[in-house]
Amino acid sequence: MTIAPDPVDLAARLIACKSVTPSDDGAMNIMADALKSAGFTVHLLTKGQAPDGPVTNLIAIRGEGYPHLAYAGHSDVVPAGQGWSSDPFTPTIKDGYLVGRGAVDMKSSVAAFIAAASRYTEHKGTLSLLITGDEEGPATFGTPAIIEWLNEQSIKPDYCLVGEPTSVERLGDTVKNGRRGSVNMWIEVEGIQGHVAYPDRACNPIPVLARIISDLESWVLDKGDQWFQPSNLEVTSIECDNKATNVIPALAKAQLNIRFNALHKGAELVDSLKKRVAAIDPKARVKAAISGEAFVTEEGVLTDTISAAIAKNTGITPSLSTSGGTSDARFLTKLCPVVEFGLVNATMHKVDEKASVEDIRQLSRIDEDIIKSFLG
């Protein structure tokens, strides 16, 4: 008989691992041991090289056949920074909260699901856990590597629950059924350096860049739709490496980000922006990096089942939302329908990050009901 780990105790053990991306510091082995004890076959994959690696990923599988429910999460954390009231990697329970880096994002969620899967071992179909050590970093060697391995093994989940902290005020108030896409762009306008007293012998790139920025700021990308707010362009940096007051600079740069909804594809937005820039300065250089496409999981079996489990345990009917930043769900949506649900996110990435002990236990009960609903 499997003795299920206590979710809070397991979360504390994981928090004690200084798994700042891309370091693991033993977190994967702790999870692997717990999952093996619960009857899972565990695969540990190491990918990549410094500076973004090596990264350790975990794939645990139990059972076989349809349906296949996957849980996805990450064990890496962001740097702790300064100003904590206690050591961020010495887990502490204070006033009913588990305090430590990763308590919210997202070691407690991973621990809650492992505990739930350890309690409910006799099920039909397939249950898997896909845990990466590279979500907070570039994600180059994380979830994409897991998906590559699954494809090589011809393993395809039917549904995926991502345990990111989605709750806002109370556990269960918000479920993410989609995410906006994100593209970063860099614009360079080249001029001709010269003395400010002789502008006829120079070409100032700053006014040209200013016109480009003004045009982009006035660009209405869309008005949003049923699931998404309007797409948004933000200028995040303007640079001109010139400290002299009597020199017209030779180069001006801008950096911007577009968070876009499912009405767009990243490449189409990049192409449209390049055309707008070229209309003002055909010689301007534009570079782009698309970090994720927008996606939405329509209401159906996955959203309904998770919402029902939340309502049963909390009395709350969650709101479906696509707000916030990107997550690894942007990769997993290529495999199957994806929904994200987890703890209250108020302190994630903050000093004295903390999760309610009762919320961790309740999350584990919700996870168990989700497993039962799909695989019972």
From Swiss-Prot:
Top-level enzyme category = hydrolase
Q: Which domain of life is it from?
A: Bacteria
Q: Name one GO biological process term.
A: L-arginine biosynthetic process
As to how many cofactors bind and how, the note says: Binds 2 Zn(2+) or Co(2+) ions per subunit.
Q: Which residues cross the membrane?
A: none
Catalytic activity as recorded in UniProt: N-succinyl-(2S,6S)-2,6-diaminopimelate + H2O = (2S,6S)-2,6-diaminopimelate + succinate
Q: How is this protein named in the record?
A: Succinyl-diaminopimelate desuccinylase
Q: Does the keyword Amino-acid biosynthesis apply?
A: yes
Which terms in the Gene Ontology molecular function aspect does this entry carry? Answer: acetylornithine deacetylase activity; cobalt ion binding; succinyl-diaminopimelate desuccinylase activity; zinc ion binding
Record Gene3D superfamilies: Zn peptidases
- Any idea which positions bind Zn(2+) 2? D105, E136, H349
In its UniProt entry, the species of origin is given as: Zymomonas mobilis subsp. mobilis (strain ATCC 31821 / ZM4 / CP4)
- Provide the organism lineage as a comma list: Bacteria, Pseudomonadati, Pseudomonadota, Alphaproteobacteria, Sphingomonadales
The UniProt record lists the EC number as 3.5.1.18
Family in the record: Belongs to the peptidase M20A family. DapE subfamily.
* Role according to the record: Catalyzes the hydrolysis of N-succinyl-L,L-diaminopimelic acid (SDAP), forming succinate and LL-2,6-diaminopimelate (DAP), an intermediate involved in the bacterial biosynthesis of lysine and meso-diaminopimelic acid, an essential component of bacterial cell walls.
Q: Which residues form the active site?
A: D76, E135 (proton acceptor)
Q: Which CDD domains match?
A: M20_DapE_proteobac
Keywords of the record, alphabetical order, are: Amino-acid biosynthesis, Cobalt, Diaminopimelate biosynthesis, Hydrolase, Lysine biosynthesis, Metal-binding, Zinc
Q: In which pathway does it act?
A: Amino-acid biosynthesis; L-lysine biosynthesis via DAP pathway; LL-2,6-diaminopimelate from (S)-tetrahydrodipicolinate (succinylase route): step 3/3
